[in-house]
Amino acid sequence: MARISGIDIPREKRVEVALTYIYGIGLTRAQSILEKSGVNPDIRVKDLEDSDIQKLRAVTEEFTLEGDLRRQEGMALKRLQDIGCVRGRRHRMSLPVRGQRTRTNARTRRGARKTVAGRKK
């Protein structure tokens, strides 16, 4: 297995797809990385030369990936919560952040239904 950015990428897949196994690299970014490094996107990872792997490592080092990216995203959410803005409060309460309705729907974000006992008459 080839190791890029501390991740073992699968040997049997095309390089273009295998790069997407790294957190922070999607298909578009994988294509741009391959274009910059001059590696053929249709080749399988197991058929890559060592020089090709070195080129890919050099290009991927320019990006924030894996743990650093996760930490950056977490700190951004924490900052929103600390300053007390609406987005931060919505994140803290596990509610939809971008203006979606919550009277109905939003089940994924709010979690399973909690039954509330009806009032006695």
From Swiss-Prot:
InterPro entries: Rbsml_uS13_C, Ribosomal_uS13, Ribosomal_uS13-like_H2TH, Ribosomal_uS13_bac-type, Ribosomal_uS13_CS. One of its GO terms (molecular function) is rRNA binding. Residues 97-121 are annotated as: Disordered. GO terms for cellular component: cytosol; small ribosomal subunit. The keyword Transcription regulation does not apply. The keyword Magnesium does not apply. Keywords: Ribonucleoprotein, Ribosomal protein, RNA-binding, rRNA-binding, tRNA-binding. GO terms for biological process: translation. Gene3D superfamilies: 1.10.8.50, 30s ribosomal protein s13, domain 2 (4.10.910.10). HAMAP family: Ribosomal_uS13. Located at the top of the head of the 30S subunit, it contacts several helices of the 16S rRNA. In the 70S ribosome it contacts the 23S rRNA (bridge B1a) and protein L5 of the 50S subunit (bridge B1b), connecting the 2 subunits; these bridges are implicated in subunit movement. Contacts the tRNAs in the A and P-sites. Belongs to the universal ribosomal protein uS13 family. Part of the 30S ribosomal subunit. Forms a loose heterodimer with protein S19. Forms two bridges to the 50S subunit in the 70S ribosome. PANTHER family: 30S RIBOSOMAL PROTEIN S13/40S RIBOSOMAL PROTEIN S18, SMALL RIBOSOMAL SUBUNIT PROTEIN US13M. This is Small ribosomal subunit protein uS13. It comes from Prochlorococcus marinus (strain NATL2A).
